[in-house]
From Swiss-Prot:
Electrogenic sodium/bicarbonate cotransporter with a Na(+):HCO3(-) stoichiometry varying from 1:2 to 1:3. May regulate bicarbonate influx/efflux at the basolateral membrane of cells and regulate intracellular pH. This is Electrogenic sodium bicarbonate cotransporter 1. Residues 251-260 have a biased composition (Polar residues). It comes from Oryctolagus cuniculus. Residues 961-986 dip into the membrane without crossing it. GO terms for biological process: regulation of intracellular pH; sodium ion transport.
Length: 1079
């Protein structure tokens, strides 16, 4: 028996296969613990009052048997041991699985105070560490906090903590209003249960009520190295001549100790800036550990108050205390006490144990929580990891939900490798989206959208009351103005100024403002699009060739298209959006993003062509370059200095006078004046402006780089959190202002933003209203239905694909979508724009994504070291409405807007195009083509889909994108919407090329991080399902005698606290606590 290995009866059912993500985020425990090679069974000692406990032991022993292990489909190894459900898991499942209507337990702030000496005389409780999510220690020297780091615990300290919970006082849901009352309650309980001698009451009370010195106070704190030099001054004080009698002891206790305790927070607590890291409803958990020389056995107590109470200066921050853990022990074990204190503090910061601590009914519940924590512990070999190395907090924390779901019940969802993991919808889709369910009633979807959005209408206005909304308004306004000017200019060229820049401004303002006020998804931004521009050009040329009235013909096309869109609304046709999977969405959004990037560089190249760089220019040959202004007609030019007008007189000189004045010096005119008066520029240096192009590219690339850098400034290490967040929110506006100032200081005449200054139609041949009859034959009104069908497809596809992208699950929108309501208002606005001869507007993908990115919300308070959590998007109607109102008022702001260089706005275009590609799986898969296998990220689809299949899917997507780009660049661009619709057919065809299993990972609308979370939950549920099936054959209830963690727990078997029996060999190697409990 001495050579036999210890049998771990709990290992088989807790077999855990760690994936890379779990290992990466859970390296939190180090230590190797000596486990005895021999096993000697404990002798069962009889107790006079332990009949019930004895019967329980015997029943458990009888029911404790080996069972066969249930193998998973993906596990090749088998175990000879039969699984037994973990008693800790069973009890935790009962605790966390209870239905409780009470709110979730609040966030805990845990503080570790240790009993240290001041100048070798007085003892004080000094703060040495604190926790919210991660551990922060007082650095050596005691003048600053360490950086937050993952708490690394010794496994031995966890065993000792478990023993503390077994043998110490557990007081749950007690009531106290002050620290002295609470201390007295604890000490009396220890005396009543025989754990403390009555003559030690005053000494323990005196010790527990000593001052608390926090790190915020500017005092002479010692380093952590002095923790081991704790003091036995309490004993000296009690044995001094002044404290010889109990009466004198009591008087000293009152005067020296209780006067140091206040029920109200101190000024240092109220001024502590660390409160910003805590939510408003946070509570405190205080851990007090120390060594004294008047105790022979450890004094251990764990207290949970019925209601959290402010206990004066006990805690660093002014938050009420809910939990109190006390450990006072004999001298010589300061290091062990310190590690036990860190262990309980770390457990209190663990989300699962945190919930158990709040819901525990007795001691066994708490012990089960510790066992569950030990089940999840990762042990690092002591020779392969230095515990002094502080582990940086991970960027993304592993979700505790998968641990909680294992115990809280729920469906046992199993994933079949031959079927899609999302439920069998062939690659995701939106079948589970309530907004896209077909009602089968006339306008049923529209009515449901109205009912869904009506309750939020008021909140859509007051939810915008945040400084973040201002930055979004300015950013999107400048993007919208630039877009309106660009498309307005192109539209004017395509339609002979029948629609121009001013019409673009007015149409954008009217359509956008009405849409944002009444549509189902006000975060969507309307704008003109490339396909609409192509259609307008073709329609104008067609009307011109056949002598049709262009505006009237366009009016009837718009009316027919609006009518068809309303039919689609009435028949709930938006349910077809559920067939737009990731393949279609990413193809469309990536194409639009690439168009933005391409157009930004195209405009800069065009600018460089207009202001060329003269590469032949040489500094030493300045005389070779010249440029002169000559009159348009050959006249006898004689230089007469006395007749040459002064510069200030040029404005009074007319073109006719200049032609008639033969003695006028044309060479005196500037370039603009020469061209204005009909002159000609002659010379090889007339178009040479060397600085404009270079300066424009500096502004262009500088704006883009600055926008990207300032947007990421939120995660930098500089400045306080509030300042970083403010800079990040206003990143685009700051970049624009910075480079506008640089442009003004340098003084180079770069091209500026030109806004119409008069409110009138661009063409004098049109008005603000288009009559519907009289310009074309009657049959044209009916024939307009044919091109209107194409426009309807264009509008429907652009609008709904953008709406799907805006309403993605990862945006965490809470007020719901409104696909039918959005399309309804697009149709109504099309009628208005058709009658006013304004451009048609539809949802703009890139600007809408930029709008959402500028309104993303994160947690206001996050624990030190913890990344802010994304909460969702600030859903409201104010930002979009004000953006379009300002766009309409831009005509009156022309004197201000003219100072903005166009290269700066092109840089904003480039930023929007690149930023909208972030988080797109298509781009991630493109990068995989350039990565060696060992450097590829841990994407969920790479775990389940062969790499060659991933590359094949990416190749097909690139091919479709290339075809769409080629189509867009030709005259056939008018059928661009039809080709977008063809992407759906291409995706359906992939069902014959890829298995549903592969498509479910490659073409799923579920975000990557949520998909990992789902998979981990399914693994846990599958594991829980096997445990449930085993539990049907076992009626073994929970007992602390049964091992419940992955490693042998025989050394932790409970023994009578005041046992008088002779300890066995195993007991001799037990913890320090067991060595002091035989008094």
């Amino acid at each position: 028996m001495e050579d036999e290995a210890v049998l771990d009866r709990g290992a088989s059912f807790l077999k855990h296969v760690c994936d890379e993500e779990e290992v990466e985020g859970h390296h939190t425990i180090y230590i190797g613990v000596h486990v005895p090679k021999s096993y000697r069974r404990r002798r069962r000692h009889k107790r006079k009052t332990g009949h019930k406990e004895k019967r329980e032991k015997e029943r458990i022993s009888e029911n404790y048997s080996d069972k066969s292990d249930v193998e998973n489909a993906d596990e090749s190894s088998s175990s000879i041991l039969k699984p037994l459900i973990s008693p800790a898991a069973e009890r935790i499942r009962f605790i966390l699985g209870e239905e409780d209507d009470s709110p979730a337990p609040p966030q805990l702030f845990t503080e570790l105070d240790e009993l240290l000496a001041v100048d070798g005389q007085e003892m004080e409780w000094k703060e040495t560490a604190r926790w919210i999510k991660f551990e922060e220690k007082v650095e050596q020297g005691g003048e600053r906090w360490s950086k937050p780091h993952v708490a690394t615990l010794s496994l031995h300290s966890l065993f000792e903590l478990r023993t503390c919970m077994e043998k110490g006082s557990i007081m749950l849901d007690r009531e106290a209003t002050s620290l002295p009352q609470l201390v007295e309650m604890i000490v009396d309980h220890q005396i009543e249960t025989g754990l403390l001698k009555p003559d030690l009451k005053d000494k323990v009370t005196y010790t527990l009520l000593r001052k608390h010195r926090h790190q915020t106070k500017k005092s002479n704190l010692r380093s952590l190295a002095d923790i081991g030099k704790t003091v036995s001054s309490a004993s000296r004080m009690f044995t001094s001549p002044d404290n010889g009698s109990p009466a004198m002891t009591h008087r000293n206790l009152t005067s020296s100790s209780l006067n140091d305790i206040s029920d109200k927070p101190e000024k240092d607590q109220l001024k502590n800036k660390f409160m910003k890291k805590l939510p408003r409803d946070a509570e405190a958990s205080n851990v007090l550990v120390g060594e004294v020389d008047f105790l022979d056995t450890p004094f251990i107590a764990f207290v949970r108050l019925q209601q959290a109470v402010m206990l004066g200066a006990l805690t660093e921050v002014p938050v009420p205390t809910r939990f109190l853990f006390i450990l006072l022990g004999p001298k010589g074990k300061a290091k062990s006490y310190h590690e036990i204190g860190r262990a309980i503090a770390t457990l209190m910061s663990d989300e699962v144990f945190h919930d158990i601590a709040y819901k525990a009914k007795d001691r066994h519940d708490l012990i089960a929580g510790i066992d569950e924590f030990l089940d999840e512990v990762i042990v690092l070999p002591p020779g392969e990891w230095d515990p002094a190395i502080r582990i940086e907090p991970p960027k993304s924390l592993p979700s505790s939900d998968k641990r909680k779901n294992m115990y809280s019940g729920g469906e046992n969802v199993q994933m079949n490798g031959d079927t899609p993991h999302d439920g069998g919808h062939g690659g995701g889709g939106h079948a589970d989206c309530e907004e896209l369910q077909r009602t089968g009633r006339f306008c049923g979807g529209l009515i449901k959208d109205l009912k869904r959005k009506a309750p939020f209408f008021a909140s859509d206005f007051y939810d915008a009351l945040n400084i973040q909304s201002l930055s979004a308004i300015l950013f999107i306004y400048l993007a919208t103005v630039t877009n309106a000017i660009t498309f307005g200019g192109l539209l004017g060229d395509a339609t002979d100024n029948m629609q121009g820049v001013l019409e673009s401004f007015l149409g954008t303002a009217v359509s956008g403002a009405i849409f944002c006020l009444f549509a189902g998804q006000p975060l969507t931004i309307l704008s003109s699009t490339g396909p609409v521009l192509v259609f307008e050009r073709l329609l104008f040329n067609f009307s011109k060739d056949h002598n049709f009235d262009y505006l009237e013909f366009r009016l009837w096309i718009g009316l027919w298209s609006a009518f068809l869109c309303l039919i689609l609304v009435a028949t709930d046709a938006s349910f077809l959006v559920q067939y737009f999977t990731r393949f279609t969405e990413e193809g469309f959004s990536s194409l639009i993003s690439f168009i933005f990037i391409y157009d930004a560089f195209k405009k800069m190249i065009k600018l460089a062509d207009y202001y060329p760089i003269n590469s032949d220019f040489k500094v030493g040959y300045n005389t070779f370059f010249s440029c002169a202004c000559v009159p348009p007609d050959p006249v006898n030019i004689s230089i007469a200095n006395d007749t040459t007008p002064a510069p200030q007189e040029l404005s009074a000189v007319s073109s006719t006078d200049m032609h008639q004045n033969a003695t006028f010096d044309w060479a005196f005119l500037s370039k603009k004046e020469c061209l204005r008066y009909g002159g000609k520029l002659v010379g090889n240096n007339c178009n040479f402006v060397p600085d404009v192009t270079l300066m424009s590219f500096i502004l262009f690339l500088g704006t883009y780089t600055s926008s990207m850098a300032l947007k990421k400034f939120k995660t930098s290490r500089y400045f306080p959190t509030t300042a970083r967040k403010l800079i990040s929110d206003f990143a685009i506006i700051l970049s624009i202002l910075i480079f506008c100032v640089i442009d003004a200081l340098v003084g180079v005449d770069t091209p500026k933003l030109i806004v119409p200054s008069e409110f009138k139609p661009t063409s004098p041949n049109r008005g603000w209203f288009v009559p519907p009859f009289g310009g074309n034959p009657w049959w044209v009104y009916l024939a307009a239905a044919i091109p209107a069908l194409l426009v309807t497809i264009l509008i429907f596809m652009d609008q709904q694909i953008t709406a799907v992208i805006v309403n993605r699950k990862e945006h965490k929108l809470k007020k719901g979508a409104g696909y039918h309501l959005d399309l309804f208002w697009v149709a109504i606005l099309m009628v208005v724009c058709s009658f006013m001869a304004l451009p048609w507007y539809v949802a703009a993908t890139v600007i809408s994504i930029a709008h959402i990115d500028s309104l993303k919300m994160e947690t206001e308070t996050s624990a030190p070291g913890e990344q802010p959590k994304f909460l969702g998007v600030r859903e409201q109607r104010v930002t979009g409405t004000l953006v379009f109102i300002l766009t309409g008022l831009s005509v009156f702001m022309a004197p201000i807007l003219k100072f903005i260089p166009m290269p700066v706005l092109y840089g904003v275009f480039l930023y929007m195009g690149v930023a909208s590609l972030n988080g797109v799986q298509f781009m991630d898969r493109l990068k995989l083509l350039l990565m060696p296998l060992k450097h590829q990220p841990d994407f969920i689809y790479l775990r389940h889909v062969p790499l060659r299949r991933v590359h094949l899917f990416t190749f097909l997507q690139v091919l479709c994108l290339a075809l769409l780009w080629i189509l867009k660049s030709t005259v056939a661009a008018i059928i661009f919407p039809v080709m977008i619709l063809a992407l759906v057919a291409v995706r359906k065809g992939m069902d014959y090329l890829f298995s549903q299993h592969d498509l479910s990972f490659l073409d799923d609308v579920i975000p990557e991080k949520d998909k990992k979370k789902k998979e981990d939950e399914k693994k846990k549920k599958k594991k829980k399902g096997s445990l449930d099936s085993d539990n049907d054959d076992s009626d073994c209830p929970y007992s602390e005698k049964v091992p419940s963690i992955k490693i042998p727990m025989d050394i932790m078997e409970q023994q009578p606290f005041l046992s008088e029996s002779k300890p066995s060999d195993r007991e001799k190697s037990s913890t320090f606590l067991e060595r002091h409990t035989s008094c």
